[in-house]
Amino acid sequence: EMAEYVNVAVDAMGGDNAPAEIVKGAVEAVNADKRVKVFLVGKEPVIREELKAYSYDAEQLEVVHAEEVIETAEPPVMAIRRKKDSSIVKAMYMVKNGECDAFVSAGSTGAVLVGGQVIVGRIRGVERPPLAPLIPTEKGVSLLLDCGANVDARPSMLVQFAKMGSVYMESVMGVKNPRVGIVNIGAEEEKGNALVKETFPLLKNCPEINFIGSVEARDIPAGAADVIVCEAFVGNVILKMYEGVSSALLHQVKQGMMSTLRSKMGALLVKPALKTTLKSFDTSQYGGAPLLGLNGLVVKTHGSSKAVEVKNSILQCIAFKEEKINEKIKEQISLEDKAAENN
């Protein structure tokens, strides 16, 4: 008897390269791993047309028709409420009612965040589900959370981010006893804004995490911590700056290398080494960012995602289910209730 599949609903219509790259990524995922089954949700005729180009085990891939598409420019709350037959809403209901374990989308971030809270729903006790992208560092990767749309956070939320992020890094990424740092503007404990000052002692006194103190933004690329905690406004700034600097550097390097004939010869020698270096700063190998703390896994992958990111976002869902991430998060959160009762 086959063990049951990890069932993943995929928004086939979301993102700049939908449906072509989404469908391709889904096929690559099922061909790469027998444990996963994908439900491609979206306009069936269009999806079927794309699927003709590929061979795959039909047992592992189904198409679910959804007539509507939520566009990136639409106000998320309204779109989720009104477009009941959209790929995002339909796929999220599949997670809510247990047909699927996870949902992957490259579509509207706002709609995914709102739908995650409203349709899939939070684990009891979780104050706010953080969007947690993996960012490349010299040592591997770090988890940066929150990078969602929730701009005002409370100290208790940041503590939950630290716990959920630690569970994820340990169980999905295999990092033993992950180091947790809080984003700050100096290493000293008395630095920072009100939120950081209030959160610092709470993290320091939290036995479930390995808190190493403040982390300055410039130490993030060096891999100063495995789990990096901040409010979403700060997280978004760090993430976008990261992406911008990476692509600017890449551009400079390409321009510089091709500028003279003599350097072209040198460029040929440098290129393989450089490619390897830049590849280590490429996040596509991990796929999207999980939205943690929901009753099911929601993965938001970049709007510009190609097949490889989609594939890896889908495969990420396997470890999430097999390592029972949500059970571990529930355990961490219910420890809070017990602690509150004892005080």
Which residues make up each language-model segment?
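Glycine-rich phosphate/diphosphate-binding loop of Rossmann-like nucleotide-binding domains
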Residues: 20-21, 33, 37-39, 44-48, ...
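N-terminal charge/polar-biased segments
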Residues: 1-10, 16-20, 49, 54, ...
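Short glycine/serine/threonine-rich phosphate/pyrophosphate-binding segments
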Residues: 18-22, 85-98, 102-116, 123, ...
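N-terminal glycine-rich anion-binding loop in soluble enzyme alpha/beta folds
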Residues: 21-72
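Glycine-rich phosphate/nucleotide-binding loop
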Residues: 117-130, 134-144, 224-228, 232-342
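Phosphate/nucleotide-donor binding subsite
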Residues: 56-100
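Short beta-strand segments
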Residues: 11, 40-42, 64, 105-107, ...
